[in-house]
Regions:
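Conserved catalytic core of the tyrosine transesterase superfamily
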Residues: 1-314
Length: 314
């Protein structure tokens, strides 16, 4: 059995169960590109190890994601008789330290939105206006980048201040309320980007300079340029600099911090946040609780240091 048809068979099987399976499918196709469309019999443990380690050649959180995806694929292939045994490492390495996402501050946003138009290269896929609007949408809604990029005109209800999010990670649609400020941002953006006479309006709200849907890779690449231009950097030991996906983490943590400060029962509110974010279950949302408590603790510590410093100078 060749690898390519087996992978396609497996992806169709997972999608038939109601899962879009986009991210794991991308990993399997990367595995196929690396090994080529070989027979299962030609696969070796070395091929699998090389894919798991990736280009960096070291164990990261991506190693465990790839391991999980390949494990599911090999179990499926074994059940279909494509292979006799799974070709995964017998020992699991120690997990790397927990990844800590970057939480954007209002000052970070001011810097990102304040980069002058003249600093943008004409070759950038996204115009300055589109880039700023995309950042405001992500910051104000916590949407995944792909969800924001796929948002269609008919899915924006200005009267009800509501977005309809379809084609989600888990194949479920959801309604996302938005604030008045973001409604104004989107309404003005649409007015500025009305199609010229004789041209059709692009199906998606946000588009590239040539009227195409925004691709994740293009947006990520342009954001890394913008982040450096704006001086938004992290100086801790994290492997990654701030990313577009961190706006989703920022939204979740900011919402939890607000509830804590309002004296709300955060545990009872957590299912609402889980639904809003389109999570598969509450466990996925619970990871933000520890992160939020750490942020509040650090904020309290900073406040105490400030107070004591003022007393010392009195």
């Amino acid at each position: 059995m060749k690898l390519a048809p087996a992978i396609e068979d497996f992806i169709r099987y997972k999608q038939a169960l109601g899962n879009s399976y986009t991210t794991p499918a991308r990993a399997l196709k990367a595995f196929l590109r690396q090994t080529g469309d070989v027979d299962f019999d030609e696969l070796s443990a070395h091929d699998v190890d090389a894919f798991l380690l990736g280009h960096g050649g070291r164990v990261t959180s991506a190693w465990f994601h790839r391991y999980s995806v390949l494990g599911c694929f090999f179990r499926f292939s074994t059940s279909r008789g494509y292979i006799q045994h799974r070709m995964l490492p017998s020992s699991i390495p120690e997990k790397p330290p927990r990844f800590v996402p970057y939480i954007y501050s209002t000052e970070d946003m001011r810097r990102l939105l304040g980069v002058p138009d003249s600093h943008y290269s004409p070759t950038c896929p996204l115009s300055p206006d589109t880039m700023r609007t995309l950042l405001l949408v992500l910051y104000g809604t916590g949407l995944r980048l792909g969800e924001a990029a796929r948002l269609k005109h008919e899915e924006v209800d200005f009267r009800r201040s509501m977005l309809t999010i379809r084609e989600t990670k888990f194949g479920k649609s959801r309604l996302v309320p938005i604030g008045r400020d973001l409604v104004s941002v989107l309404r003005l953006y649409r007015m500025r980007h009305r199609p010229r006479f004789g041209y059709e309006r692009p199906p998606t709200v946000l588009t590239t300079r040539i009227g195409m849907m925004i691709g994740n890779d293009h947006a990520d690449h342009q954001f890394q340029w913008l982040r450096k231009e704006a001086g938004v950097l992290r100086f801790d030991t994290a492997r990654y600099q701030p990313r577009l996906h961190d706006f989703r983490h920022t939204f979740a943590v900011t919402r939890l911090v607000t509830w804590y400060r309002e004296g709300k029962d955060v545990q009872r509110m957590l299912p609402l946040l889980s639904t809003y974010l389109g999570h598969c279950g509450i466990d996925e949302t619970s990871v933000y609780l520890q992160m939020t408590r750490e942020l509040l603790q650090e904020a309290n510590s900073r406040f105490e240091r400030y107070v004591f410093a003022e007393v010392d100078h009195a």
